[in-house]
Structure formats: C-alpha cells, structure tokens
C-alpha cells in the first residue's frame, strides 16, 4: 500500500476567508529587536489582508509626566527621530504585505494630546504638528484607519474584526484583565493590548450556547524595562493570527508566543529573528519614511 503524499503547507487562508494579524504594544524606542524582527518576517510570509495594531507603538517618552531614571532615557527623548520616524518606516514595511492597517491609539500616544491641551495661547497651535494621528497617517499608501484613544461619541474606541469580535487597546491593567475585559464587553469577544501579559479567559452563554473569549497576545516591547528594574515582570512576547470568514460571522485565532528570538507559525514553520533583523536595524537608523 503506497503512502499518501503529504501536502506542501500553504501560507494564508483558503478562499472565503482571510487573515487578520494582531500586533500588540511595541513602545518604540523601547521595543524588543528580536521580537519585532520575528513579527516582520511572519508578516512577510503570511501577508494578512488586515493588520490591526493595538496601540502604544510610540512610547511618547518626551511627553511623559514621569521623571527620568537615566541618561539613556534622556537620549531617548527625541520624539520625531527616535520614535515617529522608525514607526513610519515600520508602517511602510507592513504596507508591502497587507491591504489595510488599523491603528488603535493607546494611552502612550494620548500623552501628546493630554500635554498639549494643558498649554496656553500660541502653544496650542502646535497640537496638529505633533499629533501622532497626523504624523503616522500622512503618506500612507494603503487603507489606514486611526482610532483615537478618546472617543468623539459615547461609544468606546474599538475596531470590529468580526460580527462578535472587537479589538481595543485595553480597558484595565488588572491582574485578571482578560476576565474583566469579557465582563465589560458582555456579548462580544475582545482582543486587547496594554497589559503586556499573555492571558485568556473564556465563557459560554447558557441561553444562546455561544462561547466568548477575551485575550491578550502579550507585547513586543522589552520585557524588563528600566522602570521595572527591581520588579520582575510576567510579560510575554507574542502576536495573534485570526482567520475570519469573509462574511465575518465566524473566526478562529492562534496566538503564538515569541521566545528567544523565534516563533512557530500554525503550519509548523519556525520564524527566527535573524531573517528580518537587518530591516529592524535600518528602521532604527531611519530619519524619515
């Protein structure tokens, strides 16, 4: 009896569905180079139709009200060259392999608006010049949606991935954040960032029989930043891959962790940081994008 030939793995979804790639907090310039390189390479291979950024890709350290802790932080406080330019270069790279990017603003990007609104007189005129929304949106070649941190209406800022699945930056930093998010979201599943921890909570509606879940894929920033030097974190590097039916009524997710500069995709392929490290190093040196 002849053995059945094994099919060659095919990256990407089958007809009738598409891939949505979820990218959590990055905190440029305090990003983890190896984790980011893995993400860039995986994005190249998978070519998701939609790419959703959960916010805090800019640390906005220059706009922080917290005191500095080191000379390294002082050098990092160059908002345009140290944060905006690398982020724009990264967004341009992602545009090469996706049809749409959704950027959900985080509390760190909101630092800019919060500080500018405290200024008086002519200083208010600089608000638009330093707005993360304007700085990151200008010059985009693909469809780009920026969702502000503070809503213009009573509806909380969110992005609808599927009929019963939303993405938000994060509503709480609680220890059991996933359970709290699901409690708040009620009859929606929710993927969130903000907490930097990999966490999941699932519940079933006993009346309708539907299952809902809330989860955080982790983060892409340094796992032990300077301000946590004497407080070991339980942060984890990771992303989420969500396969969504084109009618957006059904979906399933896979959230690979990134460990020691590598991760494994759903088809078993191992992605390593060295495959895209050259781009990350160029991104860090870029002055414009």
Which residues fall in each region the model found?
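Conserved beta-sheet core of the metallophosphoesterase superfamily
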Residues: 164-256
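Acidic, histidine-bearing metal-coordination/catalytic regions of metal-dependent phosphoesterases
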Residues: 1-31, 285-289
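Core catalytic region of metal-dependent phosphoesterases/phosphodiesterases
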Residues: 23-140
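A short C-terminal boundary segment appended to hydrolase-like catalytic domains
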Residues: 244-289
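Feature recognizes metal-dependent phosphohydrolase scaffolds
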Residues: 6-22, 42-51, 57-70, 92-96, ...
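Short acidic-hydrophobic surface loop/beta-edge motif
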Residues: 11-12, 154-162, 202-205, 263
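A structural signal for short, well-ordered beta-strand segments and their strand-loop junctions
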Residues: 22, 51-54, 100-106, 148, ...
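Metallo-beta-lactamase
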Residues: 124-164
């Amino acid at each position: 009896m002849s053995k059945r030939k094994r099919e060659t793995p095919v990256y990407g979804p089958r007809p009738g569905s598409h891939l949505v790639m979820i990218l959590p907090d990055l905190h440029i310039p305090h990003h983890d180079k190896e984790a980011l390189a893995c993400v860039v390479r995986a994005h190249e291979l998978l070519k998701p139709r939609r790419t959703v950024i959960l916010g805090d890709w800019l640390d906005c350290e220059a706009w922080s009200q917290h005191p500095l802790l080191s000379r390294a932080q002082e050098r990092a406080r160059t908002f345009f060259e140290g944060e905006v330019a690398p982020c724009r270069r990264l967004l341009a790279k992602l545009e090469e392999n996706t049809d749409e990017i959704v950027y959900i603003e985080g509390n760190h990007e909101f630092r800019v608006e919060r500080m500018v609104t405290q200024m008086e007189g002519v200083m208010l005129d600089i608000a638009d010049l330093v707005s993360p929304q304007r700085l990151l949106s200008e010059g985009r070649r693909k469809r780009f949606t920026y969702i502000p941190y503070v809503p213009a209406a009573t509806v909380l800022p969110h992005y609808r991935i599927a009929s019963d699945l939303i993405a938000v930056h994060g509503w709480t930093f609680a220890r059991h954040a996933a359970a709290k998010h699901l409690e708040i979201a009620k009859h929606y599943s929710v993927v969130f960032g903000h907490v930097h921890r990999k966490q999941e909570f699932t519940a079933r509606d006993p009346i309708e029989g539907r299952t809902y879940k809330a989860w955080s894929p982790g983060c892409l920033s340094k796992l032990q930043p300077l301000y946590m030097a004497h407080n070991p974190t339980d942060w984890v590097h990771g992303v989420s891959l969500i396969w969504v039916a084109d009618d957006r009524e059904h979906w399933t997710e896979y959230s690979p962790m990134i460990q020691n500069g590598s991760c494994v995709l759903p088809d078993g392929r191992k992605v390593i940081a060295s495959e895209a490290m050259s781009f990350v190093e160029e991104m860090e040196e870029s002055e414009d994008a």
